[in-house]
Structure formats: C-alpha cells, structure tokens
Amino acid sequence: MSLHHDNVTIAPLVLLSVLDHYERTNTPEGKRCVGVILGDSQTNTIRVTNSFALPFEEDEKNSDVWFLDHNYIESMNEMCKKINAKEKLIGWYHSGPKLRASDLKINELFKKYTQGNPLLLIVDVKQQDVGLPTDAYMAVEQVKDDGTSTEKTFLHLPCTVEAEEAEEIGVEHLLRDVRDQAAGGLSIRLTNQLKSLKGLQKKLNDIVIYLNKVINNELPVNHTILGKLQDVFNLLPNLGYNEETDVSATSNDMVTASNNLQRALTVKTNDELMVIYITNLVRAIIAFDDLIENKMQNKKLQEERNKELQADINKVESETAETEKVATD
C-alpha cells in the first residue's frame, strides 16, 4: 500500500549543495546537473535532509539518450548509510528550471533504489522571480475522463524550506551578511511587500494562461485544479455589484458597483485607522496617568523622608542640649 504524501520539506543544506554542484561543475547554459536526495518518506510529509551529486550526460537533440552512473549511485548510497542510517534514498534532483522529456524515464530508473515512489526535486539555480526556487513532483497514474488507458504523469507537491536549529543559525548569519545594512526597517518592509505583490501577479498570470489553454483544448480539464481555483474565488470578498440575477446590467451599474467597492474599502480602512488612533490615544492616557501617579508617589516619599530627616535633626538637637546641660551642672 503506497503512502499518500501531502507536502515536502527541504533543508537549506540541500539547496546550497545543489547550487554548489551547479557552480562547481560549470554547467553550460541550457544543460542541467543531476543528483540524489536523501531523507525520510515514511510519513505524509517528505523530509529532504541531504543530497549528493551524480555524473550525468544527456543528448540535447535526442531526449531519449542520456547516461547515469549506476555503480556510483550504489557506492555513494552505501557510504551514506554508514554515515547516517536514518537518511534513505528517496529520489533525485536536477537544476531544471522546468521538467524535461526524459524525466519520467529517469524517475523509473530510481524506483529500484527507493522504497516507494521516488521524489523529483527541481531546483532553479538562476531564479529571478519571487518565491521558493524549488518544485517537487511525484509520478502517478493519471486516469482519463474519456475511459482510455492511464498514463504516467507528474503530480506537483507543495514545498517548504525548514531547518534544524543549527541550520537556522547558519542561515540567519548568511542573511545578515547579504542584507543591505543601509536600508531601514520601512524600506525593507516596502521591498518585501512589492516582491509579494509581484509574486501574486505572476501566480495570477499563470492561472489565466492555464485557463486559456483549457478553453482552447490545449490542455485536458483537471477537475482537481478547477475545484481549488473555485475555492480561492469563494474566499474573495463580495463587495461589488450584488444583483447577480440581473443579466442586463448597464455600464452605470458597473460604475456604481465600482464606487460601492471603493466606498467599502475606504470605510474599512477608516475603521482600522480609527481603531489604531483610539488604541494610541488610550495608550497615551494610560502613560500620562502612570506619570501623574508616579509623581504623586515620589512627592509622598519625599515628604516622608523630610519628616524622618526633621525627626532625626530634632533628636540630635535634644541630645545635644541635654549633654550641654549635664556639662554645665
């Protein structure tokens, strides 16, 4: 019985190893480097914790011609078992940046080295866009709606980068070195917001391109993807034109809907700003009240100290007077 995997977690060490492999071998433009990934695939979450490089060659013109050193895989796998027995061979990686025609055949080859279905990890070593430079795939049998025979295809799995405590310290130091020290906190936040919006725009463009290909019959209908897109659309706020049953909506109705949307967003923003203003006002009043209370306590303590000091002075004066009286007698 095969285990269903939900997502993939990747250690930062693996990304650095793939990048080092690509730079060290001086891979030409258009070619890719290939290696093996190690980790744990016994749970719903696949953990990729280590990797090693492989000698790999392929023909650029003919995707069916490629070379992979089997003996090297077996010897390196045995050596890795001696170093860390918990890390198993769970799949392979290449520097992409996209899937290739020969990936399914190479993936079938790795089946004899893995306990289950091998994982394919694509690491884009020259990524310019926002987001993680990784994509994880697992080969599955796709059942067609027209009743024809099934065929092998890659199923995309969501990826995250997770590090152990020791790795987190190294990554934090690395980010501290590459971060611009002259940039302030506000500029960093604005830059991150801009990158996030660019990433969102790219994702939306990908969705539009996919839907257009489905409409033009360039891609088959995938009900799972369409269901997830519908879930996303259902999460959008309905702040515009509500008369969905009115098919003959005029341009004036659209303008009114746009104005309603702007008005709703403005009201919501003003409400949030009012909450922030009231919160700051309450904080200032509490701080002012604490200041007054502190001054009153300080004044009270000062008066008590003055009384104690005056009592000590009176006591000393009385003792001095008694001493002088005794000396006179």
From Swiss-Prot:
GO terms for biological process: proteasome-mediated ubiquitin-dependent protein catabolic process. Residues 8-143 form the MPN domain. Signal peptide: none annotated. Keywords: Proteasome. Residues 303-329 are annotated as: Disordered. Coiled coil: none annotated. The keyword Isomerase does not apply. Belongs to the peptidase M67A family. Acts as a regulatory subunit of the 26S proteasome which is involved in the ATP-dependent degradation of ubiquitinated proteins. This is 26S proteasome regulatory subunit RPN8. It comes from Candida glabrata (strain ATCC 2001 / BCRC 20586 / JCM 3761 / NBRC 0622 / NRRL Y-65 / CBS 138). The gene is RPN8.
